[in-house]
Amino acid sequence: MKSHRTLYKSAVFLYLIFKGKRMLHLTLEDELFLGTPKQVGTHSTVFEHFAVMFEDDGETGYFYALDMRQNAQPIVDMLHVYNVDSTSNHHEARKLEICWDESGYVALLLINGYPHAVFDFARLVGYNSNKYPQPDLMSMWTREEITNKQAEQWLGVKTIR
């Protein structure tokens, strides 16, 4: 019998994470070494035109919101996640996960189980720890800072950061 990990890798199997009363769909799980270039992304579990992508270019980590209906420029927002030179132990492996909530509108970037960046496509809000960068002046997106209280609401469990 195949393990869940094998099924996920071979058949794009969706894990369901039950966090309190909220259900999150784990659509991507990977290993992350800060400063090692990486680009990974997933589509919403409900709306095929919404997608998110994480990128580490070797110096910084960013999380991007994409609306595939925007042919000329599908990236509608981006959030700073980290600067490699400002992190400690950046050569240690970290667990990278992207989850979508059951509505298909909220995407969470989890690193070692904590939400470092979140996009709410329904409310057009990007959440991260430093509200950087600010959205384009012509954008309808806004910024909010992630708090432990919000993280607990999204995950349904107590968090300590």
Curated annotation (Swiss-Prot):
One family name in Pfam for this protein: DUF2251
InterPro entries (alphabetical): UCP007050_HI0931 (IPR014449)
Name of the protein described by the UniProt record: Uncharacterized protein HI_0931
Gene source species: Haemophilus influenzae (strain ATCC 51907 / DSM 11121 / KW20 / Rd)
